[in-house]
Design a protein with these regions (language model features):
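Residue-level signature of catalytic and energy-coupling elements of molecular machines
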Residues: 19, 39, 123, 199, ...
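Loop-to-helix transition at the N-terminal end of transmembrane alpha-helices
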Residues: 44-63
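Helix-loop-helix junctions within the multi-pass membrane cores of secondary transporters/permeases
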Residues: 2-36, 57, 78-87, 91-139, ...
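Membrane-embedded alpha-helical modules
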Residues: 93-210, 346-456
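Alpha-helical membrane-protein architecture signal
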Residues: 12, 16, 184, 266-270, ...
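Transmembrane alpha-helix interface/packing and boundary motifs in multi-pass membrane proteins
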Residues: 61-74, 190-196, 271-279, 310-320, ...
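Membrane-helix interface/capping residues of multi-pass secondary transporters
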Residues: 47-48, 73, 97, 412
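Helix-loop-helix hairpins and the membrane-proximal interhelical loops
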Residues: 1-49, 165-168, 205, 209-303, ...
Length: 456
């Protein structure tokens, strides 16, 4: 049955590997169950409703990815997009969260149309192989940087933007211990991987979590909610109260457009559209490259199914009551564990569904336990740098700028934009356009990206 659906032998994998990979991906993504409600509740949405909507939207999107594309990619409400939803559209622009959901819903409908007409697939295929490899490396650095932030190893600095965590001080027993445990987690995970222990990333998460529990029981780790450091000891395991979902489900269709100009609405919708489009393409490029799923021409077979799953999930998420649902870069953790088919993503999806019931348990997984996984995944994605033609400056410089932009601009889509603009302009100005056989679509993308920076 599973072999018939997911073609395990054809993809050189087995059930155990796929299940382990799916659990690993879920563990590295589980933080979204806590973070997304926290961010969206700032817009006035009910946090419990958003948690349930997040779980269900993640299940729908990830299950569709498994069935429509047979790829080990998982979906959930995207970070960054949720912050834009709450802090920009609602709190800064003053629109209702219902209108923001409608913008997300319309964006999803447009994406379905673009996926059916091969526009998104054409954009994916138009990006040169060098930039695709650079995107993979850039995402690796981005994911590792997110891991360092989640572990509180890297923190804000007024003078240098970021700095390392100072372990001494009044927050030592919360932030300091958490950061130290994250470092221990990186070491444990690295040792397991060097020893070729199957499921090393997952075991690293679990061992770090257990160490956190022991530290809390002995008073070494003291929860400090004000600093974002919560108890890591589960106090309850299940909850069957789903009534809160009614506070967000279907509210997208009750949007009040009075006082909202059509141009203003489409400006909001386009922002969601742009970021989601290139974040998704970037993630698919990066993770697929890591899994050696791209063919000789740099194309991803059956990409239409993957894009359709992403599009439908965005619409479903808006109806349920959450911001844009998109393909997650944390999928790379499951790929690193050997995940190669939709059985990996189906496993992750089912765990998101179970999370609706077991949310109290999953919400206690600390960020310092999952952060080591993200850091190690970043290391694994560095391998794509070997495919970049650094000896050709016309290829190497745009690739470098792509890699540099993603962690520093904190955006996958910005990295792609800078890479596309620099690659096209550099090759055209130096007379290499014919030699490189630049796709007409690359010219279109370059113009659109430049207009974006000029007008938005």
């Amino acid at each position: 049955m599973l072999e018939k659906i997911f073609h395990l032998k054809e993809n050189h994998t087995d059930v155990k590997t796929e299940l382990m990979a799916g659990v690993t991906t879920f563990m590295t993504m589980a933080y979204i169950l806590a973070v997304n409600p926290s961010i969206l509740s700032a817009s006035g949405m009910d946090a419990n409703a958003v948690l349930i909507a997040t779980s269900l939207a993640s299940f729908v999107g990830t299950a569709l990815m498994a069935l429509l594309a047979n790829y080990p990619f998982a979906l959930a409400p995207g970070m960054g997009l949720n912050a834009y939803f709450s802090y920009t559209v609602v709190l800064t622009m003053g629109y209702s969260w219902q209108l923001a959901l409608m913008a997300v819903f319309v964006e999803g409908i447009i994406f379905i149309a673009l996926s059916l007409t091969n526009v998104r697939e054409a954009i994916f295929n138009a990006i040169p192989m060098t930039l695709k490899s650079a995107v993979s490396v850039g995402i690796g650095l981005f994911v590792a940087f997110v891991g360092l932030q989640n572990a509180k190893l890297i923190v804000n600095s007024d003078s240098t933007l970021v700095t390392y965590q100072h372990f001494k001080g009044e927050t030592f027993h919360s932030i300091g211990v958490g950061a130290i445990l994250a470092l221990v987690g990186v070491l444990i995970t690295a040792i397991l991987l060097v020893k070729k222990v199957k499921g090393g990333i997952l075991y690293g998460i679990l061992i770090t979590w257990v160490l956190g529990i022991l530290c809390e029981l002995t008073g070494i780790y003291i929860p400090n909610p004000d600093a974002g450091m919560y108890s890591v000891i589960p106090t309850s395991f299940i909850s069957f109260d789903f009534s809160a979902l009614g506070k967000t489900f279907g509210q997208v269709f009750k949007t009040d457009f009075s006082g909202v100009g059509i141009l203003n609405f489409f400006a909001v919708m386009f922002s969601f559209l742009f970021v989601d489009l290139f974040d998704t393409l970037g993630t698919l490029i990066g993770v697929a490259s890591k899994a050696d799923m791209l063919d000789e021409e740099g194309k991803l077979p059956n990409i239409k199914g993957a894009l359709m799953a992403d599009s439908i999930a965005t619409c479903a998420g808006a109806v349920l009551g959450t911001s844009t649902t998109t393909t997650f870069v944390e999928s790379a953790s499951g790929v690193t564990e050997g995940g190669r088919t939709g059985l990996t993503s189906m496993t992750t999806g089912v765990l998101f569904l179970l999370a609706v019931v077991f949310s109290p348990l999953f919400l206690t997984i600390p960020s310092f336990a999952t952060a080591p996984a993200l850091i190690i995944v970043g290391f694994y994605m560095m391998g794509s740098a070997l495919k970049i033609e650094f000896d050709d400056p016309a290829e190497g410089i745009p690739a470098f700028l792509t890699i540099l932009a993603m962690p520093t601009a904190y955006s996958i889509s910005e990295g792609i934009a800078i890479g596309v603009i620099s690659w096209t302009l550099l090759n055209v100005i130096t007379g290499k356009a014919k030699e490189k056989k630049i796709s007409p679509l690359m010219y279109v993308l370059t113009v659109l990206f430049i207009l974006k920076y000029v007008l938005l």
